[in-house]
Amino acid sequence: EIICINDGSTDDSLNILEYYAKKDKRIKIISKENEGQGTARNVGLDNAQGEFISFVDADDFIKKDMLEKLYNKSVNGNLDLVMCKVSSFDNETHVIDDNLWYYSLKCFSGFKKEVFNNLDTKEFTSLISVTPYNKLYRRSFVEKNNIRFPEKYIFEDEVFFYNVYLKAKRISLIDENLYYYRTNRKGSTVSKSQDKDYIDVIHIFRLIRELLIETNYINVYKKQVYNRFIHLILW
């Protein structure tokens, strides 16, 4: 299934979605008022019926075999979560960069475990990309733990990632660049403004602190999370 959330678009997005939905019954369109990424992704999660879940942002694209590779890895390893590397694609120059430190999972360099959990990576967990879109999640795991995005806040993916990563029993990764993050796109949120809502950042920080207390990881990750959010405020 492909669940497309039309989050109050004002361009030709809905017409394009309807064109493809007529050609493929697996495509489901849900139109709603614009309420931000967290709410839109939660609507997708609430309507998902598949065994696994993955996210693709509207202006990005993936390799044709990305989902097949992530799916096979998940099934063969009985995984709750599997990740892949991300490349950037410059919308103006069409230059592809495969070596972005944060998105290329370089923090795993030298890491040998094929299947792991958060304690195996506790020395560098805060360096792992929190983006939801380069990952495949077992839906039963997400539903069992009632994992959702906080709504109407920036950096909502931080909370979702830690909720998944701290609770997942079996995690793995594919050492390939399978997702393409589009940069320099006119009209994108990042292009419009680099201003940050510091109140939102503090709220997200509190949610993660509560999560660490709930999962008994506060003493393991307190320093890492504090450093992470100082970075977000200064970014």
Describe these PLM feature segments:
Residues 53:
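Short aromatic/hydrophobic "clamp" motif used to bind/position activated sugar donors
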Residues 11-19, 26, 61, 65-67:
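Acidic helix N-cap motif at the loop->helix transition within catalytic regions
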Residues 32-48:
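Glycine-rich, basic loop-to-helix element that forms the pyrophosphate-binding segment
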Residues 1-8, 28-33, 58:
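Short beta-strand/loop segment that forms part of the nucleotide-sugar
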Residues 26-28, 79:
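Short, conserved active-site loop motifs that form the nucleotide-linked donor/cofactor pocket
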